[in-house]
């Protein structure tokens, strides 16, 4: 009986020490006290760009196998709608299949 009382008392002391009150001053960089504002931006849900147009997301590009891909022009990264992945017909066919799967999981309306 005394052992169970000691265990309960110890548990209560640990709980009081572990959970500080809300009145205590928050420490700078304390993640539990920081608040974050989340801004939801409207994103494109339907296609509006053709192959070769600049894009930001797959949803902007029209076509089942067209994705927003990255190319490098003069050392700078440029995103544009594209469907060709290779000069080899077999690899290009596989690439279009992968583009189709990528568009399937983009959840564009």
UniProtKB/Swiss-Prot annotation:
Tissue expression from the record: Expressed by the venom gland.
Coiled-coil ranges from the UniProt annotation: none
GO cellular component, one term: extracellular region
Main location: secreted
Propeptide feature: residues: 19-46
Signal sequence range: 1-18
TM segment ranges: none
Cellular compartment(s): Secreted
Disulfide bonds: 47-62, 55-68, 59-108, 61-81
GO molecular function: ion channel regulator activity; toxin activity
Record-stated family: Belongs to the neurotoxin 25 family. F7 subfamily.
Biological role stated in the UniProt entry: Putative ion channel inhibitor.
Protein name per the record: Hainantoxin-XVIII-7
């Amino acid at each position: 009986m005394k052992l169970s009382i000691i265990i309960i008392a110890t548990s209560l002391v640990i709980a009081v020490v572990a959970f500080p009150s809300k009145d205590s001053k928050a420490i700078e960089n304390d993640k539990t006290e920081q608040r974050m504002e989340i801004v939801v931006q409207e994103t494109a849900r339907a296609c509006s760009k053709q192959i070769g147009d600049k894009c930001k997301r797959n949803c902007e590009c029209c076509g089942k196998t067209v994705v927003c891909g990255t190319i490098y022009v003069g050392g700078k990264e440029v995103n544009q709608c594209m469907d060709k992945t290779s000069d080899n017909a077999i690899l290009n066919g596989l690439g279009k299949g992968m583009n189709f799967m990528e568009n399937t999981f983009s959840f564009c309306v």
